[in-house]
A protein has these predicted regions:
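Conserved AAA+ ATPase "SRH/arginine-finger" region at the nucleotide-binding site
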Residues: 76-80, 170, 183-196
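Sensor-1/coupling segment of RecA-like P-loop NTPase cores
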Residues: 49, 57, 104-109, 133-141, ...
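A short, basic N-terminal segment
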Residues: 1-41, 266
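Short regulatory helix/loop adjacent to the ATP-binding pocket of P-loop NTPases
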Residues: 63-66, 166-181, 190
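Conserved NTP-binding/hydrolysis module of P-loop NTPases
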Residues: 8-13, 70-73, 81-100
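Walker A/P-loop nucleotide-binding motif
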Residues: 41-61
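Mid-core helix/loop region of P-loop NTP-binding domains shared across ATPases and GTPases
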Residues: 3, 82-85, 97-141, 150-154, ...
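C-terminal alpha-helical "lid" subdomain
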Residues: 177, 194, 198-266
Length: 266
């Protein structure tokens, strides 16, 4: 296998790294700061990015860092369905038996959220991943979950995570009530050219290899092909290393990188 050819102790360039392996890019640090603020001050947050930019990873690492005695994470990965389906998913995350009608569901969820805050001293954080797929009626339900009569307390924190389409959707007049509530937002960018070099070195070292395996031309070609998007970088790097091992080459050069980019469809 190509891992043993290069002497790796484990497979590098995983799309699901543990927190210790996360690369602290400038963009990642910006997201981290905003999510920490959101956890402390509550409200609504928005994180967007291209496919593979690391949005879901950012949300996962953020929630893993929280004290489970103080926070309850409600994670909804909504790919299709109606507003009623979304509310049912949220109710299930709250360990509720979902009511049959929309109005009853909203009241049911709101009541559970208040009880969590007041009785268990837990603050719920609702994360809507792939939120760009939410239909308009579903998005219109979210402000209702943030209203608690005349009480100004922020009993529920909402984090919307999705592709750039989500920003365009939220710019519509029908979603002004939700848009005005957004207190923190950030668009997650890819790695810069310098960060790409550092990222490659970090991933190799974490897998047990200290010497560089990508020459200058390969690294430049990788940046041009991936624009620094982490998932694309990981895919291309693994493909290039596999092809290099097959060719008995100890390094990835431009020619190997170009073949890898074609195979990885980048």
């Amino acid at each position: 296998m190509w891992e043993s050819f290069f002497g790796f102790k484990k497979t590098p360039f995983s799309d699901s790294p543990d927190a210790k392996q996360l690369f602290a890019s400038q963009s990642w640090n910006q997201v981290k700061t905003r999510l920490e603020f959101l956890a402390q001050h509550h409200g609504v947050g928005l994180i967007t990015g291209e496919v593979g930019a690391g949005k879901s990873t950012a949300a996962r690492v953020f929630t893993a860092s929280l004290n489970t005695n103080l926070y309850k994470i409600l994670y909804v990965h909504f790919s299709s369905g109606s507003a009623l389906d979304l509310l049912r998913q949220i109710a299930l995350e709250l360990d509720l038996e979902p009511a049959h009608f929309r109005g009853d569901l909203v009241r049911q969820i709101s009541g559970a959220v208040v009880r969590l805050n007041q009785s268990k001293k837990q603050h719920p954080i609702l994360i809507c991943d792939e939120a760009h797929l939410l239909p308009h009626p579903a998005l219109e339900q979210l402000p209702l979950l943030l209203n608690f009569d005349m009480d100004s307390s922020r009993y529920l924190t909402l984090l919307l995570v999705g592709q750039p389409l989500l920003r365009r959707t939220l710019s519509l007049q029908m979603h002004e009530a939700l848009r005005q509530r957004i207190g923190v937002q950030y668009h997650l960018e890819g790695l810069t050219r310098d960060e790409l070099d550092a990222y490659l070195a970090q991933q190799l070292k974490a897998a047990g290899v200290s010497q560089p395996l990508f020459d200058d031309t390969a690294r430049q070609g990788m940046y041009q092909a991936t624009k620094g998007i982490p998932r694309k970088v990981n895919k291309l790097a693994m493909t290039a290393l596999r092809l290099a091992a097959g060719a008995k080459s100890q390094t990835v050069n431009e020619a190997i990188l170009l073949d890898a980019a074609a195979e990885a469809m980048l």
